[in-house]
Regions:
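Short His-Asn-centered micro-motif
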Residues: 37-39, 77-79, 95-98, 114
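Short, charged/polar "capping" segments at the starts of alpha-helices
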Residues: 42-46, 120-122
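Helix-adjacent hinge/juxtasegments
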Residues: 48-88
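Glycine-rich, aromatic-bearing surface loops/beta-hairpins
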Residues: 109-144
Length: 144
């Protein structure tokens, strides 16, 4: 399988929640199954709420680890969530909202990372980039 990591470059004015919703929408339209993970429980809750109102004319079906719906291809979970019957579903896209690199990337075809405008976050993104590149993932950058 050809694994890839996509780094989305965020502008200073881009907020994480809107950026994630745009990325989810893009992959939803491509019929991908998306797993979004963050240690930040409130970030997951904010993204969940925003997905309900993100666009007036469209709805992106999704669920969370708290209210799981097996018919949706998009799930938002807290990092460390351990329900294998849910996590072993074939989520081909993993959106990593944590500072740590996704080392078990073999579970997903596409790893999505966000590159935020501040220097500390850029440094973390560079480290992730090198990790994925050194592990032979096809790495690319996209603007949001």
């Amino acid at each position: 399988m050809d694994y890839k990591a996509i780094f989305y470059i965020l502008n200073a004015e881009d907020d994480t929640e809107n950026a994630v919703c745009k990325i989810i929408k893009k992959h939803y339209e491509l019929k991908n199954a998306v797993l979004v993970s963050s240690k930040d429980k409130t970030l997951i809750e904010r993204i969940n709420k925003l997905l309900w109102t993100f666009e007036q004319l469209s709805f992106i079906p999704h669920s969370t680890d708290k209210k799981y719906d097996s018919f949706t291809n998009i799930i938002l979970v807290e990092t460390g969530y351990k329900n294998d019957s849910i996590l072993k579903k074939d989520y081909n896209v993993f959106i990593n909202l944590d500072d740590e690199v996704k080392t078990d990337y073999h579970d997903h075809e596409i790893i999505v990372e966000l590159v935020k405008a501040n220097e500390d976050k850029k440094k973390i993104a560079r480290e992730k980039y090198l990790y994925y590149k050194n592990n032979k993932l096809n790495v690319k950058h996209e603007n949001l």
